[in-house]
Amino acid sequence: MDEKIETRLIGATMQSNEPDLERSIRPKRLSDYIGQAAVREQMDIFIRAATNRREALDHVLIFGPPGLGKTTLAHIIAHEMQAGLKQTSGPVLEKAGDLAALLTNLEPHDVLFIDEIHRLNPAIEEVLYPALEDFQLDIIIGEGPSARSIKLDLPPFTLVGATTRAGLLTSPLRDRFGIVQRLEFYRIPDLIHIVKRAAHILNVVIDENGAGEIARRSRGTPRIANRLLRRVRDFAEVRANGMINESIAKEALDLLNVDIRGLDVMDRKLLETIIKKFQGGPVGIESLAAAISEERGTIEDVIEPYLIQEGFILRTPRGRIATELTYQHFKLPLPTQSTLQENFDLLGKVE
């Protein structure tokens, strides 16, 4: 992926310098896990019940957009179960032996966390099925005619799988999770709480309005909120007395080109192109990609999802259309109905 996409300030994927920072502010207990009230309440019940029965927790699948706390929740599950945690990711497990090495080193009730579980090799999945259902591992010893299969008993353990693409999981794998949790984008009050908690851990002085300004521009995502907090902290230390209030946060985020709705330069460029070059749309994806000099995949996978989710653009069979919200955001007059109809007719002829 393009380097500028990977280092996008409001990108939800983790950047190379962030793992240690995220670990330092990650909550360890379910009671400290902010937001996701339904998920938190359900997991509290499931964990208490399993603990009281002295059993391993059922296997857990956590899915949702990046940056919402899937890894954090996996760590909390292990901590609350007073169990060890082994962590890996789907792409890292290249052969059956890699998975076998992890499984045979688990202690009773341990948690095995597999991030990006939708990217597991199908051959690895086949090894995983009996381990999940029967806590047994089938291993092939030898090669050719002399090869034989032996079964190893595994201690009861909990698999926690995390994915941003639940639809890519195979049905047999998905069906083996007893607990499935979907993480939603966060509300502003929860993000304010998250920003204030991170500020306290990082020894940053911030008031309620300053936290609110950061939260509103964080696209409903804690990872982005914490990243913006660190950048605003830099600004406050250099340009002010180190304290973050509403005006300091606003000035810093404006300087960073993150507007009040969390849109950055790439978002605004795409929206303004639809409005100014294509009269609000509809515009085909290939034409749009050429107009803003971006790859089609970048638009579809990186830029568009948040804009569609927030209602800035509509994706129709005829192409992308800027909504009324987009015109309001840029303080531009709405196009007439006749202009929109002409655009539809023109695109239909081109296609």
Swiss-Prot record:
Residues at which ATP binds: 25-26, 67, 70-72, 133-135, 176, 186, 223
SMART domains documented for this protein: AAA
The protein's Enzyme Commission number: 3.6.4.-
Keyword Chloroplast: no
Binding site for DNA: 296, 315, 320
Region (Small ATPAse domain (RuvB-S)): 187-257
Keywords from the UniProt entry: ATP-binding, Cytoplasm, DNA damage, DNA recombination, DNA repair, DNA-binding, Hydrolase, Nucleotide-binding
Location(s), subcellular: Cytoplasm
Residues noted as binding Mg(2+) in the record, renumbered to the chain: 71
Cellular compartments per GO CC: cytoplasm; Holliday junction resolvase complex
Main location as per UniProt: cytoplasm
Annotated region described as Large ATPase domain (RuvB-L), given as residue ranges: 1-186
InterPro entries: AAA+_ATPase, AAA_lid_4, DNA_helicase_Holl-junc_RuvB, P-loop_NTPase, RuvB-like_N, RuvB_C, WH-like_DNA-bd_sf, WH_DNA-bd_sf
GO biological process, one term: DNA repair
Region feature Head domain (RuvB-H), mapped onto this chain: 260-351
Catalytic activity field: ATP + H2O = ADP + phosphate + H(+)
GO molecular function, one term: four-way junction helicase activity
Domain-level remarks: Has 3 domains, the large (RuvB-L) and small ATPase (RuvB-S) domains and the C-terminal head (RuvB-H) domain. The head domain binds DNA, while the ATPase domains jointly bind ATP, ADP or are empty depending on the state of the subunit in the translocation cycle. During a single DNA translocation step the structure of each domain remains the same, but their relative positions change.
Family annotation (PANTHER family): HOLLIDAY JUNCTION BRANCH MIGRATION COMPLEX SUBUNIT RUVB (PTHR42848:SF1), PTHR42848
Function: The RuvA-RuvB-RuvC complex processes Holliday junction (HJ) DNA during genetic recombination and DNA repair, while the RuvA-RuvB complex plays an important role in the rescue of blocked DNA replication forks via replication fork reversal (RFR). RuvA specifically binds to HJ cruciform DNA, conferring on it an open structure. The RuvB hexamer acts as an ATP-dependent pump, pulling dsDNA into and through the RuvAB complex. RuvB forms 2 homohexamers on either side of HJ DNA bound by 1 or 2 RuvA tetramers; 4 subunits per hexamer contact DNA at a time.
Subunit structure: Homohexamer. Forms an RuvA(8)-RuvB(12)-Holliday junction (HJ) complex. HJ DNA is sandwiched between 2 RuvA tetramers; dsDNA enters through RuvA and exits via RuvB. An RuvB hexamer assembles on each DNA strand where it exits the tetramer. Each RuvB hexamer is contacted by two RuvA subunits (via domain III) on 2 adjacent RuvB subunits; this complex drives branch migration. In the full resolvosome a probable DNA-RuvA(4)-RuvB(12)-RuvC(2) complex forms which resolves the HJ.
Membership in a protein family: Belongs to the RuvB family.
Protein name: Holliday junction branch migration complex subunit RuvB
Organism name: Coxiella burnetii (strain CbuG_Q212)
